[in-house]
Amino acid sequence: MGGADKNRERALAATGDELTALLHHPDAEVLLALLDNPSLDEAQLCVLLERKSLPGEILEEVARRKPMLKNYRVKRGLAFHPRTPRLVTLRLLRELYLMDVVQLTLLPGIPTELKRSAEDQLISRLPQLPLGQKITLARRGPARLAGALLAEGHAQIIGIVLDNAYLTEAQVLRALSRERLPPGVVRSIAQHRKWSITYNVRLALVRHPSSPLATVLAYLPELTVSDLRELASPGIVPESLRKYLQAEVQRRIRAREKSAPGEDTAGPSAASNED
């Protein structure tokens, strides 16, 4: 019997420390034999799944063995392994605990399709979740989930989710693109220390019908003339606001005529956006 055959025989019958040592064997055939060892328990299988260099064929074999997947730690270890086939992980997503799905979306290097599927699953669960879990997700959830929570507009959640480190400008703008938002959402964004000074967010707040007039008027001097003109076009904002936009455009034109040619008359935060 050759050395490889002997190692496979050892893997099939090993127990105790010998079995534990074989969990780190480099030969995939030995590892496959270990999976058939009746002494292999869930804890040892989880140790095996912690090997980042584990061959894909081992992961596929574990995924095929339904009795092994009855153990949640094994299921989780398989789903989180970077070499697990994408279709296997997608199938396991439905069986993971909520916060494990959140953690999966935040893994460095997670494939885009897999991350999006995990986020979609989290968003689909939101209507059934109690407030306490939503608050946890508002603090720690990925960008798309944070954006969905922001759009829901729960008073206890808005401030928390706006402070979420993963929340992106794109998600804030997506929320503001909805005409029907709980009033607290628009007000909280307009008062937030980070988002209220972001140019594109200010622009979206000016567009939004629920924005307080005082907030909108305070932003007008910071907008570029081209954006003011676009906003003042018919049908973009209420007629009651258009007159203020048109007045601001005229003020800029008069100021520009009085200034030296080429001198910028927009506010400092809009200088890089001016025509």
For the regions a language model picked out, list residue spans one by one:
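Alpha-helical scaffold segments
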Residues: 1-275
